[in-house]
Design a protein with these regions (language model features):
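Aromatic "clamp/platform" in nucleotide-sugar-dependent glycosyltransferases that forms part
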Residues: 268
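Glycosyltransferase donor-sugar binding loop
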Residues: 38-42, 184, 213-228
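Nucleotide-activated donor-binding/catalytic signature segment of Leloir-type glycosyltransferases, i.e.
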Residues: 227-248
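Short hydrophobic beta-strand element within catalytic cores of glycosyltransferases
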Residues: 285-289
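Membrane-proximal helix-turn-helix segments that form the acceptor-binding/catalytic region
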Residues: 121-139
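Conserved donor-binding/catalytic core segment of Leloir-type glycosyltransferases
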Residues: 4-6, 140, 164, 173-192, ...
Length: 363
């Protein structure tokens, strides 16, 4: 099977698809003949060393005829994302040649995501994206929760998650005094629910201080996010509880994970957050809202604590995590067990099966 992957990724380390897309394609290449075409220049030099990777700087002008000869008629095409106008030229060729394609929206089609920049989304949907999604052979959602929250889109769909490789080092000991909760990811107040987290902490600030809880947020300062957060922290006098840090990567990121007692993520919406799966793979218990799309799995596995996407719910989740301190080693082992479900090669095999079904339906 010839599978053509199309993306528009600059390769910033703080973006989840920078990590998940290459790993997905790498493991798919063990089963299928793949070509990965990125419709912009990447800052990741290691991608250029991959035998199946190409870069096209034509953007909107990229067409199927620009592909290598053996991939000008692929069996199926995968668009890594939805809201990318550079996909437009290629998709017209696919419609003309009746080549099936799959769109991977990564939460972009959920109800909450559609509320972000709603006018821009409305105009974009009317101009192109309604038809782009509607004519897809299928949408690949990363979780059942994402699929359910994207129910307004009537395109056939299936669920295949992101994966994670096992970690050589995992969490072994927890703090004797106090608790350290960490978040690593984008500092987007709305999507990541950081405003909800700050408000929740303000409700139980005395309890958090008494338990010596500190919450460390790591991520790039983009669009004035740090200034906004610092203003909120000062308003609620939370500067001794919530701390802001620049993004961490590689060995520094691993150190932060292993020095933390739990990973916290209070997102309003996600596809499948690689940061949280990675934290589970280190054996970190998780504090997760329903918007992360992992809350149900974490609750069922007893790998952490969960809440709805409300300030009161997050406050109660924090209380539960503080009260449960003696159970952190047990929840750590459960986190490792949960992360083992996200094996990349098994995911590639499941994806191959879904692609085969799509191709066979079209024959």
């Amino acid at each position: 099977m010839k599978v053509l992957f199309i993306s528009k990724l600059e390769g910033h380390k703080w973006q989840g698809p920078t990590h998940s897309v290459p790993m997905q394609i790498k493991h798919q290449s063990n089963i299928d003949e793949v070509l990965w075409v990125n419709l912009c220049a990447s800052i990741n030099p290691e991608w250029k060393d991959l035998p199946y990777y190409r870069e096209s700087e034509k953007g909107l002008k990229t067409r199927l005829a620009d592909m290598p000869a053996d991939f000008q008629k692929p069996d199926i095409v995968v668009f890594e994302g939805v809201y990318e106008y550079p996909f437009a030229g290629l998709v017209y060729d696919l419609w003309a040649r009746k080549i099936p394609y799959v769109a991977v929206p990564r939460s972009a089609l959920t109800a909450d995501a559609q509320k972000k920049k709603p006018l821009k989304k409305l105009l974009g949907n009317m101009a192109f994206f309604n038809v782009f999604v509607g004519k897809a052979a299928a949408i690949q959602y990363l979780t059942a929760a994402e699929q359910k929250d994207s129910a307004k889109w009537k395109t056939p769909s299936f669920v295949v998650p992101n994966g994670m490789l096992p970690k050589e080092r995992t969490k072994q000991t927890f703090s004797n005094e106090g608790l350290i909760f960490s978040y690593i990811g984008r500092m987007e107040q709305y999507q990541k629910g950081l405003d909800l987290l700050v408000s929740a902490c303000s409700r139980i600030v005395r309890e958090l201080r008494a338990a010596k809880v500190t919450i460390h947020l790591y991520g790039p300062d983009r669009e004035g996010s740090f200034a906004q957060l610092r203003e909120e922290l000062a308003r609620y006098s939370l500067e001794d509880i919530i701390f802001l840090h620049d993004g961490v990567f590689g060995e520094d990121k691993e150190r932060v994970q292993l020095e933390s007692d739990a990973f916290i993520m209070t997102s309003r919406f996600e596809g499948l957050p690689m940061g949280m799966i990675e934290a589970l793979a280190y054996g970190l218990p998780a504090l997760a809202t329903t918007g992360t799309n992992l809350a149900e799995e974490i609750r069922d596995a007893e790998a952490g604590w969960t809440s709805d996407n409300s300030v009161d719910g997050i406050a109660q989740m924090l209380r539960a995590a503080v009260a449960d301190k003696d159970r952190y080693p047990e929840r750590s082992q459960n986190a490792l067990g949960l992360s083992a479900q996200y094996n990349w090669q098994a995911i590639a095999e499941k994806t191959h099966g879904e692609f085969s079904n799509i191709i066979n339906r079209g024959k």
